[in-house]
């Protein structure tokens, strides 16, 4: 919300285009795959999967920046299985697990495992600056602006 290029004005302009708001990426990706919608904002692996199946879609990463969310994982501080949970996190971050992620068309968090076919290296994708504390603080106001913009 505090970005002059991608903040409130951008969201309000988006709302003027009557976007389809779906509860998940699946319906949006199917809309663009069928040609019912000319563009959609979805997780990148879905576009790669659709293209691999012959759908006439192309993936574009915004030059203004893309969010980077790759298989989030964490350990609850009050977990009774701290050691097991940490071992699982360590596995998820291992070279072997990240190679599996790449094979499943996900962008890895490691730089030594490559990327899915026809996907740029992570270093070549402009990523958004994500201040998680600020995002959390601004969440309610951002949701309100978004809901107002897309429901009018």
Describe each region flagged by the PLM.
Residues 1-64:
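Ligand-binding pocket segment of bilobal, Venus flytrap-like solute-binding proteins
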Residues 1-2, 70-81, 100-101:
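A bilobed periplasmic-binding-protein/Venus flytrap-type ligand-binding module shared by bacterial periplasmic
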Residues 5, 22-26, 34, 41, ...:
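Soluble non-cytosolic domains of exported or imported proteins
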Residues 45-48, 64-67, 80, 94-98, ...:
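Solvent-exposed loop/turn segments at secondary-structure junctions
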Residues 55-67, 76-79, 117:
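Short beta-strand->loop
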Residues 88:
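Substrate/cofactor-recognition hotspot
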Residues 91-115:
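Periplasmic-binding protein-like
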Residues 118-152:
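Extracellular/periplasmic bilobal clamshell ligand-binding domains
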């Amino acid at each position: 919300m505090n970005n002059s290029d991608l903040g409130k004005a951008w969201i309000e302009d988006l709302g003027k285009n009557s976007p389809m708001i779906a509860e998940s990426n699946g319906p949006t990706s199917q809309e663009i795959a069928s040609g019912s919608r000319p563009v959609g904002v979805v997780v990148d692996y879905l576009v790669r999967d659709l293209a691999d199946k012959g759908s006439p879609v192309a993936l574009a990463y915004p030059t203004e920046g893309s969010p980077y969310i790759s298989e989030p994982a964490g350990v609850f501080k009050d977990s009774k299985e701290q050691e097991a949970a940490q071992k699982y996190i360590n596995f998820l971050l291992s070279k072997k697990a990240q190679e599996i992620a790449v094979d499943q068309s996900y962008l890895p968090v490691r730089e030594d495992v490559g990327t899915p076919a026809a996907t740029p290296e992570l270093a070549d994708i402009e990523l958004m600056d994500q201040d998680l504390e600020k995002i959390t603080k601004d969440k309610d106001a951002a949701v309100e602006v978004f809901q107002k913009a897309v429901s009018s």
